[in-house]
Amino acid sequence: MLDRLDAALRFQQEALNLRAQRQEILAANIANADTPGYQARDIDFASELKKVMVRGREETGGVALTLTSSHHIPAQAVSSPAVDLLYRVPDQPSLDGNTVDMDRERTQFADNSLKYQMGLTVLGSQLKGMMNVLQGGN
């Protein structure tokens, strides 16, 4: 039964983990907007999610726990999976070699934030529905 519950929540869990990682990458791009030679980075979210889901099924028959902080107690958990970072190709290269386009980064940051919040909402509604069923509700 627990494996069915895990399977029901696996997609949202992994999507949220990747969204959080992407948010950190986008924040680093924004923080380094004025750093000469800094190369803006990002991930291909869809392909990374697919890789994580396939890898989770192959390794454990499910998706393993993910450590999000070095202060967490490891319990058969693995650290966040390494994602393939891609370099952004700038529309207009700057003279100092920095490839951060602040308009694009802010847009991507806001879009990723909204999708993260949507993922939390969907996960919350899935959990609420499961609790309703477990409590004998309609």
UniProtKB/Swiss-Prot annotation:
It comes from the Bacteria. GO terms for biological process: bacterial-type flagellum-dependent cell motility. Disruption phenotype: Defects in flagellar assembly process. It comes from Salmonella typhimurium (strain LT2 / SGSC1412 / ATCC 700720). Structural component of flagellum, the bacterial motility apparatus. Part of the rod structure of flagellar basal body. Belongs to the flagella basal body rod proteins family. It is found in: Bacterial flagellum basal body. This is Flagellar basal body rod protein FlgB. Pfam families: Flg_bb_rod. Keywords: Bacterial flagellum. One of its GO terms (cellular component) is bacterial-type flagellum basal body, rod. The basal body constitutes a major portion of the flagellar organelle and consists of a number of rings mounted on a central rod. In Gram-negative bacteria, at least four rings, L, P, S and M are present, whereas Gram-positive bacteria lack the L and P rings. The rod consists of about 26 subunits of FlgG in the distal portion, and FlgB, FlgC and FlgF build up the proximal portion of the rod with about 6 subunits each. Its main location: other. PANTHER family: FLAGELLAR BASAL BODY ROD PROTEIN FLGB, FLAGELLAR PROTEIN. InterPro entries: Flag_bb_rod_N, Flagellar_basal_body_rod_CS, FlgB. The keyword Chloroplast does not apply. The lineage of its organism: Bacteria, Pseudomonadati, Pseudomonadota, Gammaproteobacteria, Enterobacterales. The keyword Signal does not apply.
